[in-house]
């Protein structure tokens, strides 16, 4: 008899974004001419930077030339890209990260799930609430949780609320946890963490022998110079943290696929036999076995991000989306919405009006305004009564969406 991984049966309904798509498609089936504007899923809309396109075009020519053709590349990524990442994203900010500690991949989403391959099932796990659903769902799939309760919380997980009631600060848990997921700038709330706040987490992790999974996919949107871009800016973080980054949002690589994970070589855990085990070695083994690397063409495009032209072009992209976020904040606040985030992050977190549930507000915006956002409850129980609006869209669409919403709620 064939057995399935029955942990999948514990997953609550559909993954958040497919459920949004189901509702939108149902509405469009009845209203095929509705001018839908999507400010929900965090997908970019603006073209790839010219520097990246030109580098990829040249790489395509390389693939057509026997002398420059590339077959299988290093599973960890080409050295020339890893060296650029180390120099520009870490060493330039005072972080002692070596190129060999960087693993290039096809997405931070994939890596935050795949990293569980090198950890056992008996770890205690902490996530913020609300939270990027992938952190929770991948742990459910891997058998690290119990069943979900009526609020959607899974047994075996420690939930750390980040809401307006605590100024969106992730409080250190009173109990000991082994694996900690942190994402700053935060998805979905748009909240940021100060150096002092992150240092407290690093100190907690070192004291308790914990590992922090730090998702910095949105660090490029930080404009406040006092805020850390990497957890490795904090003292001791190399001893307790793995960081995930992506080219998806800063360089528009959502459809091109390139990211990277940093696993410091001095990061160790103790095996059941008392032996200290290097996590870098485990992750390197995992990637070498299960991953064939990102394509040469895409990696050349990612390398171009670090050129002088590339840096200028991605700054233009980031500024564009941040201005969209500023417009969303300003327009919604003008008609009385309580609005958070959207300053050092591309997401605006909105309190739903008149006591509406997150999904009721979703339906109201869809039906009355033909605008799609993301229900806060889809990110966890503490997200109920909130709504995420993404700045990733054209200026024209953002302005039109705000016009529709402010007209409906003024």
Curated annotation (Swiss-Prot):
Similarity-based family: Belongs to the class-I pyridoxal-phosphate-dependent aminotransferase family. LL-diaminopimelate aminotransferase subfamily.
* Family matches, as SUPFAM superfamilies: PLP-dependent transferases
Q: What does this protein do?
A: Involved in the synthesis of meso-diaminopimelate (m-DAP or DL-DAP), required for both lysine and peptidoglycan biosynthesis. Catalyzes the direct conversion of tetrahydrodipicolinate to LL-diaminopimelate.
Subunit description: Homodimer.
The record's annotation in InterPro entries points to:
Aminotransferase_I/II_large, DapL/ALD1, PyrdxlP-dep_Trfase, PyrdxlP-dep_Trfase_major, PyrdxlP-dep_Trfase_small
Keyword Cell membrane (UniProt):
no
The residues the record assigns to binding pyridoxal 5'-phosphate are 72, 108-109, 132, 187, 218, 246-248, 257, 292
Q: What is this protein called?
A: LL-diaminopimelate aminotransferase
Q: Which reaction does it catalyse?
A: (2S,6S)-2,6-diaminopimelate + 2-oxoglutarate = (S)-2,3,4,5-tetrahydrodipicolinate + L-glutamate + H2O + H(+)
Broad EC category: transferase
Organism of this sequence: Picosynechococcus sp. (strain ATCC 27264 / PCC 7002 / PR-6) (Agmenellum quadruplicatum)
Q: Name one Pfam family in it.
A: Aminotran_1_2
Q: Which domain of life is it from?
A: Bacteria
What Gene Ontology terms for biological process does this UniProt record contain?
A: lysine biosynthetic process via diaminopimelate, diaminopimelate-aminotransferase pathway
Keywords from UniProt, A to Z, are: Aminotransferase, Pyridoxal phosphate, Transferase
